[in-house]
Amino acid sequence: MAKIKARDLRGKKKEELLKQLEDLKVELSQLRVAKVTGGAASKLSKIRVVRKSIARVLTVINQTQKENLRKFYKGKKYKPLDLRPKKTRAMRRRLNKHEENLKTKKQQRKERLYPLRKYAVKA
């Protein structure tokens, strides 16, 4: 089987991808048997190509799965941990913009009663 391109895989359905993955795994096992029994050099060099193709298929499957999950959870209140932004622990616990701008009743009253003084400079 020739080297598979990821862009060709992205258009396929999940069932097709799983079937292709199964075919690649069967081919890999046959190549490994050929390696043990002393197969041709062309078969031995093909093992690497097939392994990388399997990795490509799995990568495309996982990426599309994650993309679909992102679409599903978009706008929902709770998301799985792996779909939330990573950031650092401290950044995740930090107050958000709205919480930072909140003021207590006492602070609001003080600002209303004692506004900032405006001075005019005499030229």
Swiss-Prot record:
Modified residues (N6-acetyllysine): 19, 43
A Pfam family of this chain: Ribosomal_L29
Localization annotation: Cytoplasm
Residues the record lists as Phosphoserine modifications: 29
Record-level GO BP terms: maturation of LSU-rRNA from tricistronic rRNA transcript (SSU-rRNA, 5.8S rRNA, LSU-rRNA); translation
GO molecular function: mRNA binding; structural constituent of ribosome
Annotated keywords: Acetylation, Cytoplasm, Isopeptide bond, Phosphoprotein, Ribonucleoprotein, Ribosomal protein, Ubl conjugation
A GO cellular-component term linked to this record: cytosolic large ribosomal subunit
Region Disordered: start-end pairs: 95-114
Assembly information from the UniProt record: Component of the large ribosomal subunit.
Role: Component of the large ribosomal subunit. The ribosome is a large ribonucleoprotein complex responsible for the synthesis of proteins in the cell.
Annotated protein name in UniProt: Large ribosomal subunit protein uL29
Organism: Bos taurus (Bovine)
Lineage: Eukaryota, Metazoa, Chordata, Craniata, Vertebrata
Gene name of the record: RPL35
